[in-house]
Swiss-Prot record:
<dbReference type="InterPro" id="IPR032710">
    <property type="entry name" value="NTF2-like_dom_sf"/>
</dbReference>
<keyword id="KW-0614">Plasmid</keyword>
<feature type="compositionally biased region" description="Polar residues">
    <location>
        <begin position="15"/>
        <end position="24"/>
    </location>
</feature>
<dbReference type="InterPro" id="IPR037401">
    <property type="entry name" value="SnoaL-like"/>
</dbReference>
<feature type="region of interest" description="Disordered">
    <location>
        <begin position="169"/>
        <end position="218"/>
    </location>
</feature>
<feature type="compositionally biased region" description="Basic and acidic residues">
    <location>
        <begin position="169"/>
        <end position="179"/>
    </location>
</feature>
<protein>
    <recommendedName>
        <fullName>Uncharacterized protein y4vH</fullName>
    </recommendedName>
</protein>
<dbReference type="Pfam" id="PF13577">
    <property type="entry name" value="SnoaL_4"/>
</dbReference>
<feature type="region of interest" description="Disordered">
    <location>
        <begin position="1"/>
        <end position="24"/>
    </location>
</feature>
């Protein structure tokens, strides 16, 4: 103590602001990477739904790594084999609708994630005898995702079934049921959604054809 009652101890130096800022930057970068990774995984899952519903081979293949495995109901084997099996079925124009909810992503490291997503699937089409069947399926996709060269895809999938309900298909034709509600969904490449990408390509290649030349009318 000095004569004025003060302390002779040296004041505590403030923390280095540069270290604090560096730490914050690192945390922000990790958070942003985490968000990007989560969104990439969700996008892959949603792309799978389009691929299976539209029988879009390119979309389906973009969801799995080449060495991926798929345990999918009665099918168990390579993902490539499942894709071919699905295309053989769904290219025959059945009604097929997949929806996803409750997507839970648990990272096992920087390049692996365990992902559970709930699905609801309504499928309607001909069986092996030619009879029309309709079934409502509910369950979960239990997926192991891997990130390779910056891209997330499925390396292992197990489909868990929680609900199966066979339904009586309507007797009326699609033309009668849909009536004026047009257009209706179709397999790749005939579904209207693919026109959107065509227009985007056209806009890049020939922007003036879509937005005008910019010249005043005479």
């Amino acid at each position: 103590m000095d004569g004025r009652g003060g302390s002779n101890e040296a004041p505590i130096a403030p923390r280095s602001s540069s270290l604090t800022a560096s730490h914050r930057t690192m945390m922000n970068e990790e958070s942003i990477t985490n968000l990007f990774d989560r969104e990439a995984i969700r996008d892959c899952l949603h792309r799978y739904c389009r691929g299976i519903d539209r029988a879009d081979e390119a979309a389906l293949r973009s969801c799995y790594w080449p060495d991926a495995r798929d345990n999918h109901g009665s099918y168990s084997g390579s993902a490539a084999g499942f894709i071919q099996h699905a295309l053989n079925v769904f290219k025959t124009k059945p009604r097929n609708i997949h929806q996803l909810t409750n997507i839970i992503i648990e990272f096992l490291g920087a390049t692996e994630a365990a992902v559970e997503s709930y699905f609801t699937a309504l499928q309607r089409g001909h069986d092996a005898t030619g009879e029309i069947k309709q079934v409502l399926l509910c369950g979960r996709y239990c997926d192991l995702f891997q990130k390779r060269e910056g891209e997330w895809r499925i390396v292992e999938r197990t489909v868990v079934y929680d609900w199966v309900e066979k339904q009586r298909p309507p007797k009326s034709s699609e033309a009668e049921r849909f009536g004026p509600r047009q257009p209706i969904g179709a397999p790749h490449p005939n579904d209207p959604v693919y026109e959107l990408s065509k227009r985007r390509v056209a806009a890049k290649n020939h922007p003036k054809d879509l937005i005008g030349s910019g010249e005043e009318e005479p």
